[in-house]
Amino acid sequence: MTTEVELVVLADSEGNPIGTAPKATVHTKDTPLHFAFSTYILNPRGELLVTRRALSKKTWPGVWTNSMCGHPGPDETNADAIRRRGVDELGLEVDSFLDIQEILPDYQYRAVDASGIVEWELCPVHLVRLAVGEFVEPLDDEVEEFEWAEPQKLFDAVDATPFVFSPWLVDQLSAPELRQAILEAFDAE
């Protein structure tokens, strides 16, 4: 029995792919720049899925964050990677998403957690609509707990207590275009 190794795509400072490395070896105190994605999932009522990272996670354990993050594999589009992670992380079906919009295509961040582990990612941010009748059943090793939040209430909580949330969520939600896209999607419901 063989286990497939999840690879992440490494990047140079210009955002060009320069190779791959096993995901298990990438996140260290000297993390190389690599490709990732970040998602904000809206249910049919226009509420945002906010997740609390599993306590067993290597980086930022137990921290509240956006709906889902991940890494596209070699030759995998972000949309395909989002669908894959929706299955692997949130227990969704591969066709659970109605719409995947890239809102912040050039988002990049570097953050260091309390243990010294670095996240350094080219990480486009996506807004995703969940189909009617779909239910989130997160895997325990990925998500400790989750909540569906009205967007403005989440924005207010992030503004008042940013230390409760992941640094990438706080930074991403400081972008007016992301907040606007989320509010427009919420108001459309």
Curated annotation (Swiss-Prot):
**SUPFAM superfamilies the record matches:** Nudix
Q: What is its main location?
A: cytoplasm
Q: Which InterPro entries match?
A: Idi_bact, IsopentenylPP_isomerase_typ1, NUDIX_hydrolase-like_dom_sf, NUDIX_hydrolase_dom
* Catalysed conversion reaction: isopentenyl diphosphate = dimethylallyl diphosphate
In this protein, the active site sits at 69, 121
What is any one GO biological process for this UniProt entry? isoprenoid biosynthetic process
Per UniProt, residues of the Nudix hydrolase domain are 32-171
Positions annotated to bind Mn(2+): 27, 34, 71, 119, 121
What UniProt keywords apply to this chain's record, in alphabetical order? Cytoplasm, Isomerase, Isoprene biosynthesis, Magnesium, Manganese, Metal-binding
Q: How is the cofactor bound?
A: Binds 1 Mg(2+) ion per subunit. The magnesium ion binds only when substrate is bound. Binds 1 Mn(2+) ion per subunit.
Q: Might you report a single GO cellular component term?
A: cytoplasm
Q: Which residues cross the membrane?
A: none
Top-tier EC class: isomerase
**Pathway(s) this gene product operates in, as recorded in its UniProt entry:** Isoprenoid biosynthesis; dimethylallyl diphosphate biosynthesis; dimethylallyl diphosphate from isopentenyl diphosphate: step 1/1
Any idea which positions bind Mg(2+)? 69, 89
**What is its biological role?**
Catalyzes the 1,3-allylic rearrangement of the homoallylic substrate isopentenyl (IPP) to its highly electrophilic allylic isomer, dimethylallyl diphosphate (DMAPP).
NCBIfam families from the UniProt entry: IPP_isom_1, PRK03759.1
Name used for this protein in its record: Isopentenyl-diphosphate Delta-isomerase
